[in-house]
């Protein structure tokens, strides 16, 4: 069975070195397509001619962990159907440009066991603009559900820090209840923003990953929730 050696990957529990900078360029079409992919109908995010047109805050979420220097000798790669987004954190320090080029740098901060035969790899990512100013800080956890087959990672000792924390459900009624309708072809739309994991569209890939049918991207669900919360509590206003 595949073995994770987290102690060798992250000696003394320290984060890995930052990966090489990655340049990412995006345009108006990318911004609009992402907004539609998370169910937004707000013209501030879906119409470039709106006077307050802007990039939806979670637009860069899918870049989390890109370029992180993962030592595959110690942390073997999992096929995409056995990898799913587990947890995300995003802090917008400065609105992203409406279009242009940004720089990403990522590093590994933790590798820990999760359940029987699974692993959890966490990364930290910074997104900076052309002036070198940080626009977005992100942390993401990737749930590795196997390397060769579902749940085949040997038990191992974790290393590094974790951003993961248990969320206690308040013992009171919710302040607000929100509902939305997700289209049956939402995964096909959302994947056009760059997440082409077959788990979300191909029944065979979904079965390999242990699911009866394709599942919606977790980041698409996150985007829908962010869209609802932004509308309910901020009037759709995303600017700092």
Model-derived regions, located:
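Residues in flexible loops and secondary-structure boundaries
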Residues: 32, 67, 98-100, 116, ...
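HotDog/MaoC-like acyl-thioester-processing domains
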Residues: 1-19, 83-178
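A contiguous, surface-exposed recognition patch within enzymatic or periplasmic domains that forms
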Residues: 2-49, 158-221, 228-231
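Active-site palm subdomain of RNA-directed nucleic acid polymerases
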Residues: 234
